[in-house]
């Protein structure tokens, strides 16, 4: 298996030396990033229409009850996220006379951010040396596996947290692969720490 994996990675590196033309691109650049994110987002659309105006977990309902003073405020749920849900619910009530529509704005943010993050993750695996055919498989899985659109059509601390955890993992892996050189830039270190803090605070 190790020999096969090494051969595949070497083959992928040789592929990088050849210019590829076609709809599916996996180069580490803006255009492939946006294109693959769009593919994922379009494939998720049927689930988004089906699940409108979103799925709200029991934890989210509990946090809203805390925000409105029905339940006692405790540290069982993240403070920042409880306030965030409450503020968007208040905005929905003010702007649309329905708090659910305010909360759905957060789901829309998730449904935009998640395909962009998945596309970044896909392109990074290609950058690591994953062969192009396997990138096709990755893209199909991310776009067609129903768990992902159902998950991000839901609103909960887990769905918010993963939006920070994915980029943290990518930066962390990149730091290991580059033996720390990618973390030498202050901006990257600060970003990584912010992602770590946000992922922890939201979970």
Where are these regions (language model features)?
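Start-transfer (signal-anchor) and selected internal transmembrane alpha helices
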Residues: 1-46
